[in-house]
């Protein structure tokens, strides 16, 4: 502390959030986790006796995988996402996988390639199976995906990415894997598209 005050420093927003988390843990005996918080803070916040320096190792601290974002994250709303993004920052994450709303990218791209609304939505799988579609090894399972879901998750995805950027994170976005819907062969019969086995 300095002059009886708690002072947290960092060279970026994620470092500051990490410093805050360290202060809560090691000076206030508090805890923030996925499964619950213990934030019974003392009436007067303790001032550390000595300065503590911590270095965050690793330039890129990646978080999430496709399965986490399908099994659990697919059902999160904005409130839950805000908590998760804060949790990431408090735990030094600066490079999260960020694919909320990717179904909207696919939907709109397929429309531009001449798919109907029904065809584009039928290509997309249900939210619990997004991991397999994004990896990519599945299509048209559990659909068609409702347009209301697509629209709401385009908006949610923008909120998630904007918040991650505000905190100085670099979201990992899905690139094009080369996989296309099998229906592309009907729509573009001259194209050289290799069909994978069922």
Could you say what each language-model-derived stretch is?
Residues 1-9, 13, 18, 27-28, ...:
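Aromatic-lined carbohydrate-binding surfaces of glycoside hydrolases
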Residues 31-33:
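Conserved short beta-strand edge segments in small beta-sheet-based binding/regulatory domains
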């Amino acid at each position: 502390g300095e002059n009886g005050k708690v002072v947290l420093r960092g060279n970026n927003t994620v470092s500051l959030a990490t410093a805050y988390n360290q202060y809560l843990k090691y000076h206030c005996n508090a805890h923030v986790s996925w499964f619950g918080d213990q934030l019974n803070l003392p009436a007067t916040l303790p001032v550390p006796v000595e300065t503590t320096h911590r270095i965050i190792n690793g330039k890129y601290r990646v978080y999430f995988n496709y399965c986490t974002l399908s099994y659990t994250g697919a059902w999160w709303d904005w409130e839950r996402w805000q908590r998760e993004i804060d949790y990431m920052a408090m735990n030094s994450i600066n490079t999260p996988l960020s694919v909320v709303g990717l179904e909207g990218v696919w939907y709109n791209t397929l429309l531009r390639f001449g798919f109907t609304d029904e065809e584009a939505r039928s290509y997309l799988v249900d939210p619990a199976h997004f991991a397999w579609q994004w990896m990519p090894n599945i299509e048209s399972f559990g659909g068609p995906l409702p347009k209301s879901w697509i629209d709401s998750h385009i908006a949610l995805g923008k909120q998630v990415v904007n918040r991650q950027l505000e905190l100085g994170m670099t979201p990992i976005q899905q690139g094009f894997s080369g996989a296309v819907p099998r229906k592309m062969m009907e729509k573009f019969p001259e194209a050289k598209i290799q069909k994978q086995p069922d």
